[in-house]
Amino acid sequence: MTLGFLACPLGAQKPREKPRTDPPIKVKVVVVSMFEVGEDTGDIPGEYQLWVEREHLEQIFPLPAGYHHVRMNKDGVLGLLTGVATAKAAASVMALGLDPRFDLSKAYWIVAGIGGGDPADVSLGSAVWANHVIDGDIGYEIDAREIPADWPTGFVPLRKATPYEQPVKSQLDGEAYTLNQDFVNWAYQLTKNVSLADSDKMRNTRMLYVGFPNAMKLPFVVRGDTMSGGTFWHGKKMDEWANAWT
């Protein structure tokens, strides 16, 4: 067996490239989506694809420290696909924020995702502008089969002893965020009369919600609150918990 290696004289090393001198790209809006089903374009859409296609996010920038490359159009709209769950989202947003190619100092951020809604409040296909954003993962959880008989749920707020214990802490530790209400109202007023997409399949599904007038309406735009977490949940009991928690 013969071992060999290549060596390059020190003086012949390639000179270092000069740092980039191009001014950073000014970003007007960052649209954040969590997941995509397949490719960015041309197949079944998830959260990201319709933004890419309809906003013509045709310029691609690799983002090695993030989950996915970013895409941008000529109007300053940038699309960011973060991947599912908090860790990927945090890493992707940080990767973009620290990237010297982009100037985000004047950028507005839209977190645009698919979520469930209470049939007492919204119908399938409706759009909700959030006033408050709640992290449903922060707290304590006791198995519902082992909780006291008078407890409505096994979820307990952080540093509390019982479900929904009052008063709410004056200093929250990441459990909830209040968005700029003037800005939210501006967005709502601008979009409240927009006709949203509908289909026969959606209409047939809405008809199943007898006794829930809002759930049987055509898709509409509304203001509300949103709660997110790492677990997808469903059902009347979980819905009651989410409303009370919010």
Give the residues covered by each predicted segment.
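Bacterial N-terminal signal peptides
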Residues: 1-7
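Sec/Tat signal peptide C-region and signal peptidase I cleavage site
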Residues: 9-11
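Accessory terminal and edge-of-domain segments that mediate assembly/interaction
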Residues: 13-246
